[in-house]
Amino acid sequence: MSRLRWIVIGVLFSFALQAEAKHFIHIQEDASADQKTAVLILNGFGGTKKGCQAQMAFWADRGMDVFIPDVLLRSSLKESSDALEAFVEAQHLEDYREVKAICYIAGAYLLHTQLETHPMANLTRIVYDRSPTQERAPQTAMARIPKLGMLKLGKVLRDLSVATWPDVPESDQLKKGLAIENRATPLMRFLQEEAEAMGPLVYDWQAIDPTAHDAFHVALDHDMMYVRWDVLGEPFLHFFEHGVFPADLPRDRIHDRPFDPTYPLPE
């Protein structure tokens, strides 16, 4: 079987797993919302059932209520945004003392759209998963494998590939941090030519988001960012508490071989 066919089968399988995901919610019943902090995790296309389970396994034991909505895969990006709006309203996130968010790529689009029309005065932290390679997935997939992408993700993939992104939220109480992937997924290695044709890959965190307060680089790919809480958990908790990441984490690009699958992974 050709390498291309194996890759396509793998992509189909990973997209199929995404379709299984549902809301994951953990609520502590020992206090009212105005005495608690909520963690809102907004996944992207990589938010599989396995990924959500790994997220919940780490975050449910951290003294906060945890909300992982399944809102992305709808018939359009507009319906995805509407689904998030309905989820936030149904869970009464405005009642919490604080809300701290983790946003993957498409999840960031949904959060920013939500905040344009429904500002959250209690939102105090956002950690963004940023990936110079994976952020080109919608455009490159639509360029090379549009039928496959549309088959599994529908119009949302197409919509996101041409979407104008909402402004990045800013407020006096909000601190934003970036976790920057330095490794490409198998999908993006397959789409390397299309990704590189879009222009230079930018890894300078202050160029990626000039409004961010801090960042760190990690030798993980996008799929791993959903499950490697042994690597990501403590840095994210530290940012939630202090508004900065631990001082010993790398602020500069780790290596210049994002498409090299042999580069060592974090232990």
Regions found by a protein language model. Give the residues of each.
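Bacterial N-terminal signal peptides that target proteins for export
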Residues: M1-I7
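Hydrophobic h-region of N-terminal signal peptides that target proteins for export
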Residues: V11-A19
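Short, surface-exposed "cap/lid" segments of acyl-processing enzymes
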Residues: F24-I27, A31-V66
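Serine-dependent carboxylesterase/thioesterase catalytic core
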Residues: L40, W59-P69, K78-Q173
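Short beta-strand/turn micro-motifs composed of small residues
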Residues: N43, C103, I180
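Short, solvent-exposed loop/turn segments at secondary-structure junctions
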Residues: G46-G47, A108, T133-Q134, N182-T185, ...
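Acidic-and-aromatic substrate-binding clefts and catalytic sites of carbohydrate-active enzymes
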Residues: G46-K50, L72-S80
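C-terminal catalytic-base region of ester-bond hydrolases, centering on the histidine
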Residues: E170-E267
